[in-house]
Swiss-Prot record, chains A, B, C, D:
This is Chorismate synthase. PANTHER family: CHORISMATE SYNTHASE (PTHR21085:SF0). GO terms for biological process: amino acid biosynthetic process; aromatic amino acid family biosynthetic process; chorismate biosynthetic process. Its EC number is 4.2.3.5. It catalyses: 5-O-(1-carboxyvinyl)-3-phosphoshikimate = chorismate + phosphate. Pathway: Metabolic intermediate biosynthesis; chorismate biosynthesis; chorismate from D-erythrose 4-phosphate and phosphoenolpyruvate: step 7/7. It is an enzyme of class 4 (lyase). Keywords: Amino-acid biosynthesis, Aromatic amino acid biosynthesis, Lyase.
């Protein structure tokens, strides 16, 4: 199924950015577990700083409601449907580009594939859909935490600017409230907005407390599954496991083992596709967003050369908004791997 | 299924490096197509330079035989079973390490997961299994070629040494026969062997002639599928699509469109997870192999600190042997995506 | 996935009978196809005579709305979400049995499995959910018809009463409007209602115009798939393909072949799991419904022996209401098999 | 995948009756479990009485060998490959019918679908393949038995002859060794062979000791899965769950519940697709085999009317040989359902 992921607990997402609603359907989940709209709402709101501060001005309410699969706040074992209403449908932002293919976007490939041009701001390809992954993924957040697993994301680079490691200690919330006071970041972001430009970014994720033996060779190794799902996030270009193995020889990167544990973790917690109990280290590279308000050469549906300019709201650094999405998808991947391992115990 | 891949035509591989046989089972293939053992054998032999020249001295015959699913050399539509006999079973190479966990290898994680130590030279986790992927994948090679698709792999880096671009014009065979005469490469490889070291490598794959519209958003995007399968290859650490997006802003990497085509291809042929008709550009990073004949600290099954030394044959640059494996898996991925697209025509 | 079916075009259904909504999500469908709520609404309304005439008095509006996956009435290729609001939520009907396990129903097994008792009239196990299968399945109805395929269902037996074959010529609608005038049926149904009883039934489905070569041996034979999906319908107990093979020898049931075609069709259009071009003949047996207003011995959640009496509305012959459900699921199965065959052309 | 079944532990079968070998590949199985060729061989031999006594004279050795996935007789967690060599390849038996489509067989439909005529005695469609299901399924037999589950098959009818219930107490082996002494059966079988005829049969399976809560609504109900797999067996025409619900009203078939348990078991151990702890009751109807040595009208590949006569060995009652196949597939289904339930504990 093209629009589902998860081997045991399966998430299906649906909805277009400028359609009526977006949402997620969770199948294969436990019964008799408390889930509350409040908790999911809180996590969705966590997504907002990443979408609005410095970023796009689009103001969504993202009000989520659970419609099926629960009774008196507990799951029944039946599929759980969550819906988020789209309030902020400013199709007008995008009207002037309706007949143009925005370079770097899905417009051209979606038109060729689906013989169809849904110009309403990206439609199904829009990053708005990722709200569904956050809403559904956070349902597993506590289950993961209760097993001692902590997922933390760090912004390593914005454009060419390397983020000072001392900021890596901050929780992501505090990091963002302090963003304004980190001068270099403030400057680089503002320059971007003023020059109608956007920047690449590198996000690092470290997962602590993960039990060993997760992952299923040969073709469902944990790094295979993680890359499959995380590279489905818009604007991702690259994924890397462990610390940088470029230009290295084996003496430089060997992880020796003592009876007190591993002496290092170059491999980033994964050996032969299975977790070894050490922290997972994953790095993802995001390209700069392609919607800017600068002029850019493209063609329209009649294949005529034109110059395009997006008047809509755009994101100077789209990688930042991806952080809650990455974490949510990781909760889903991890709970699935943990349940899969349980089968054989 | 942990040991299968492919959405329509499915490949299952099996067998251990020091077991009796290894092989592949192909299900969902066309009927009435000629396939010959000779052709598969030829492709398997192409794998040998990558495994023996400069590399491991292990000398496999890799003689393949088709046992089911054909009649008078044509496929019947039933599953096709290919078997390769293991002749070169030198378990003795590995005996002294049987109770030790070789760092960087699957030993430790496989022991934890399967409660079982198959010390016969890596067993199921060994790179030997990749011969099965080559044998099965090449069945689709001609189908892909007949559609005008050409898959080419290039070695970009060995250790810190960047390979001169002029060599990128060589077919891979010619490249390898000339390797000996490329002094820098010769030197770096020999140094490695003499110092019992091994090197990382970067492989670039360029795919020309691929039709647009391949790939299925949101979770079966073509980059998702490719990363899922290619990162299942031993020693892979990173995958990257398109040209380097690090430290960039959008002006530097925009692919403008004219009615004569795209003006550039930074995105490497993929937009929003769907091919756009331009060449696919994929880069994979391999870590240095962990089996060297240098001493390395580890523990044995009784959790006692010891020093380990592999007397077996090892590979100074494991990325090189992966090239035919990458190409074979790509044939399988591409034929599946092409057939999937066919459904909707 | 427990709550999805369909190999290429996948339907997921969700919702409980006395929850807020029920619905279906269609993934993998064509783009650029017209679908309208009116057409789906019409088909849902066709379901009503089967649910209300003679049958349960529960009066649902079954008003369907499409929320995603369309733009200007055409499919975009993205998942299509249909929702049906539950208006007629008379939980009070069921209150007096809330702590009792209704024999023959899902109550007992669902309680054991999900550790949870959703007493709201059957919840997820209720036949109400089948409205989702009708709503989604009819989307494929025209596609099937345009290929010359006609699916027709006939009621062969109600209780012990065999329906006169002459009525098999009627379209189902006409059959039902005439039901009142078919005395034997009228009598048997009324007796049922008066004595608070319910009856078994046998439904025969004949599919004409189906192309040969549909079905995928060995484990996705068309009879395997059909039985898998149709036996998921509530109250089904048996499925049979072809004409009755009981107590037969081979001379009695051989289908000889002439160059003008088959001389008979005992095998009901399927040979070795693949269609042969002849009409498919399928027969399904439904058990009598278990909810009646007669007293029946059972236990409550405290495992105390009690007598139960359902005051809610019940169905004297549940097999009748299944007819549109059977047909809808068959449209889904058939379109999937036809698309699967297309891959190999 | 067309040639695999099983949701967690997956079996893939392959091979043609007159090809080199047949076999099975088991993926997703436990590690560290003892399996021995002897045990599998013993179970395969159990299959022989069902295939040779009274039945076909084809004498296979059915010698099985395990090639991968084990080390020192214990499973490693890697895929397990079992191969059975075909010794008794009398293609000559079938030569005279090579250009004819044997009515009632797969010949015609396989020719249309695969554009290919593998006349070697049924090829992939032959019942010989079922040996693979027996070989793989018996691996799970002990696991099931250790959970207190007993699977027993009974022959209820051969042709029109109803088997006296007193024989239902015999284990199947003893039943068969006594077959010769059960006069009615002896007579009916001999008449068959003399008149070159064959008979239908009804097999009843009763499964005791199965835990409740197995089965996954809505589309992976246990009856759905069982029917899907069992109807893939050659010559099956019908499957029925529970006791006969034909011509019944609800008073006749209600299963009341007391705190001491159910008062009856008309539903045959399944409610709403989930086991309720009572014995499962399944009945399967087999058609008479179509290969007889009587003349029968058919066409050849040139579409010319001819008369066909099979000189090969044929089976007077093909349902009998299916018994070990049914049981093996049930072990596979049950272990999968049990493991699936384990996920949620």
């Amino acid at each position: 199924m093209n629009n589902s992921y998860g081997e045991i607990i399966k998430i299906s997402t649906f909805g277009e950015s400028h359609g009526l609603i977006i949402g997620a359907l969770i199948d294969g989940f436990f019964s008799n577990l408390y889930i509350s709209e409040k908790f999911i709402q809180k996590n969705l709101n966590l997504r907002k700083p990443f979408t609005s501060l410095f970023s796009t001005q689009r103001r969504e309410q993202d009000k989520v409601k659970i419609f099926t699969g629960i009774f008196k706040n507990k799951t029944t074992g039946a599929p759980v449907l969550m819906l988020i209403k789209n309030n902020d449908k400013q199709s007008s932002d995008y009207n002037n580009i309706s007949l143009n293919f925005r370079p770097g976007h899905a417009d051209y490939t979606y038109f060729l594939k689906y013989k169809f041009r849904d110009y309403r701001g990206g439609g199904r390809s829009s990053a708005r859909e990722t709200a569904c992954r956050v809403a559904s993924g956070c349902v597993f957040k506590n289950l993961i935490y209760n097993k001692g697993v902590i997922v933390r994301s760090y912004i390593k680079k914005i454009g060419f600017l390397k983020i000072n490691f001392k900021y890596w200690n901050y929780t992501l919330n505090r990091f963002f409230s302090n963003l304004l006071f980190i001068n270099e970041i403030k400057d680089i972001i503002n320059n971007c907005k003023n020059s109608c430009n956007s920047l690449s970014s590198e996000i690092v994720i470290i997962i602590n407390g993960l039990e060993p033996s997760l992952g299923d060779p040969l073709y469902k190794k944990i790094n295979s599954t993680i890359s499959n799902y995380l590279l489905s996030i818009n604007a991702t270009k690259s994924i890397c496991f462990g610390f940088n193995f470029k230009n290295k020889n084996s003496f430089q990167v060997k992880d020796e083992i003592k009876n007190s544990g591993f002496t290092s973790n170059n491999n980033g917690g994964i050996l032969a596709g299975i977790t070894n109990g050490q922290p997972l280290v994953i790095k993802i590279l995001f390209k700069p967003t392609s919607s800017t308000s600068r002029k850019i050469k493209t063609i329209n549906e009649k294949l005529k050369n034109i110059t395009n300019k997006t008047y809509g709201r755009h994101d100077p650094c789209v990688g930042l908004r991806a952080v809650p999405v990455i974490e949510s998808m990781l909760y889903t991947i991890l709970i699935n791997k943990i349940l899969k391992k349980k089968i054989y115990e």
